[in-house]
Curated annotation (Swiss-Prot):
Belongs to the APQ12 family. Residues 59-67 are perinuclear space. It is found in: Nucleus membrane; Endoplasmic reticulum membrane. GO terms for cellular component: endoplasmic reticulum; endoplasmic reticulum membrane; membrane; nuclear envelope; nuclear membrane. This is Nuclear membrane organization protein APQ12. InterPro entries: APQ12 (IPR024316). Involved in the regulation of lipid homeostasis in the endoplasmic reticulum, thereby impacting nuclear pore complex biogenesis and localization, and nucleocytoplasmic mRNA transport. The lineage of its organism: Eukaryota, Fungi, Dikarya, Ascomycota, Saccharomycotina. Keywords: Endoplasmic reticulum, Membrane, mRNA transport, Nucleus, Transmembrane, Transmembrane helix, Transport. Residues 1-39, 85-138 are cytoplasmic. The chain crosses the membrane at residues 40-58, 68-84. It comes from Saccharomyces cerevisiae (strain ATCC 204508 / S288c). The keyword Transmembrane applies. GO terms for biological process: lipid homeostasis; mRNA transport; nuclear envelope organization.
Length: 138
């Protein structure tokens, strides 16, 4: 057992990130060699890949917005059906708006808790990557 290397119980996220680092360490020199030997093909592939990723992200975002609007429409229809249009539009929407405005920092609190939990994982991966770099430089 190596005394200099601390033993970590690696979670699934840490294992995935470690594997991703290994793949990236192999990919960077390969891509560099390919881009030096075939610059035009590399540029065309990079542009195509960039547009493809942008297109997929845009389509996923549009799908997400459409699903949110459908859900909002369904909830609104159910609310109007159950409470009546006058009650729903004048009282319920106002109460919902006041509730959202009073708890607007709730999502930020959840986000902060998530970031704090993720920071421990990132520190573990950073330490492992730093040790691997030190081993490679020796």
């Amino acid at each position: 057992m190596d005394a200099t290397q601390p033993q970590y119980e690696l979670s699934v996220v840490t294992q995935c990130l470690k594997s991703a680092i290994d793949v990236i360490q192999w990919l960077i020199p390969t891509i560099t060699k390919f881009s030096q030997s075939h610059p035009l093909v590399f540029q065309l592939l990079f542009i195509f890949f960039t547009f493809y990723v942008f297109y997929k992200l845009l389509m996923n975002f549009i799908t997400l917005v459409k699903r949110f609007l459908y859900l909002t429409l369904v909830v609104t229809c159910i609310g109007i059906y159950m409470r009546g249009s006058q009650q729903f539009l004048t009282v319920d929407l106002l109460n919902f708006y006041n509730f959202v405005m009073s708890n607007r920092y709730y999502a930020f609190k959840i986000y902060t808790l998530f970031i704090n939990a993720l920071e421990r994982e990132i520190n573990t991966v950073y330490h492992l990557a730093q040790m691997k770099m030190e081993q490679l430089l020796k």
